[in-house]
Amino acid sequence: MIKNKNFYINGKWVSPSKPNDFEVIDPSTGEPFAIISLGSTEDTDKAISAAKNAFETWRETSKEKRLSLLEKFDQIYNRRWDEMVKAQSTEMGAPLDYASETHTKMGADISKNIIKILKDFNFEHQFDLKSNNRI
């Protein structure tokens, strides 16, 4: 039985502010396979605050650094493919081949597309202020 009751907030694993255990059921067997904690309003507020604070530095992060982080994420995702398939199969009750070919592949495809789009995306555009082609 997996027991994962902590939340990842502001760069560290933290206990929930109030205990609120929840059994996660494998739909294919009807048996519980994990116990997680459902967050409270206080936990949600902490996570939102941390995300807002993180955005202050993230918005200044260079395109190159963002690409590097996304490519690292993509490598780790693919290296842990079998774990992702197993987790998705267990959580949704899907056959392993379906979880691999559909759900896990979708995550990999989205990751690759985000990287591709970011490589070609220009965050800034210099307008010719002397031309008549203004908005």
Q: Where on the chain are the PLM-derived regions?
A:
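Donor nucleotide-activated moiety binding/catalytic core segment of transferases
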Residues: 135
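N-terminal Rossmann-like NAD(P)+-binding subdomain of aldehyde/semialdehyde dehydrogenases
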Residues: 1-132
